[in-house]
């Protein structure tokens, strides 16, 4: 009888730990489409880290998952609160300086800036808002369609791709 009680206590404790980790630390996610191709492809399995959101540690270039209505999307942060942003002739400019990162150059995006967003006064991203963009230019399930992404809608940043095994990635390069 004591073994059964010990087993049940261990099982309940394990369930509580798993629920805590999935609620506050990390969660698994399957990439549902090719919005972030070639960086992430449909069917890739990733770990989403919730800690960077909780402690305001999101950076430009981070790949995040976020909610929009009942859907979950994956995009890259290209501008954070307090920054300005514009695309001119396929090049990303942040705070009026060209961004030297692979995701920011030679894009098929013509002209796009914060002035395209409705409900935004000025050229500076307000607190707790982000501009996100997909790596795949033709898919506009990002700030071009949704506008600013509120921090409260961000689930976390993708910190690990564990499947397919041949594409194991711990840290995504900008």
From Swiss-Prot:
Keyword Transmembrane in record: yes
Gene3D superfamilies to which the protein is assigned, alphabetical: Umud Fragment, subunit A
Gene Ontology terms describing biological process: signal peptide processing
Extracellular side: 29-174
Cellular location(s): Cell membrane
Membrane topology: Single-pass type II membrane protein
Lineage start: Bacteria, Bacillati, Bacillota, Bacilli, Bacillales
Keywords per UniProt: Cell membrane, Membrane, Transmembrane, Transmembrane helix
Name of the featured protein: Inactive signal peptidase IA
Organism: Staphylococcus aureus (strain MRSA252)
GO molecular function terms listed in the Swiss-Prot or TrEMBL record: serine-type endopeptidase activity
TM region positions: 8-28
CDD domains registered for this protein in UniProt: S26_SPase_I
Function statement: Catalytically inactive.
Cytoplasmic side: 1-7
Gene (UniProt): spsA
Pfam families registered for this protein in UniProt: Peptidase_S26
Family: Belongs to the peptidase S26 family.
Gene Ontology cellular component list: plasma membrane
């Amino acid at each position: 009888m004591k073994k059964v009680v010990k087993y049940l206590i261990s099982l309940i404790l394990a369930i509580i730990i798993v629920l805590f980790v999935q609620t506050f630390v990390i969660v698994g996610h399957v990439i549902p489409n090719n919005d972030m191709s070639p960086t992430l492809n449909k069917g890739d399995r990733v770990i989403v880290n919730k800690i960077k959101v909780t402690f305001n540690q999101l950076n430009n270039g981070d790949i995040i998952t976020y909610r929009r209505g009942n859907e979950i999307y994956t995009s890259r942060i290209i501008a954070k609160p307090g920054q300005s942003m514009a695309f001119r002739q396929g090049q990303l400019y942040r705070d009026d300086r060209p961004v030297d990162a692979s995701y920011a150059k030679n894009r098929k995006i013509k002209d796009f800036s914060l002035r395209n967003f409705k409900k935004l006064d000025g050229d500076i991203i307000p607190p707790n808002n982000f501009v996100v963009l997909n790596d795949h230019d033709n898919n506009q399930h990002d700030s071009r369609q949704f506008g600013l992404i509120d921090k409260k809608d961000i689930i976390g940043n993708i910190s690990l791709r564990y499947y397919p095994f041949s594409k194991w990635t711990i840290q995504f390069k900008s």
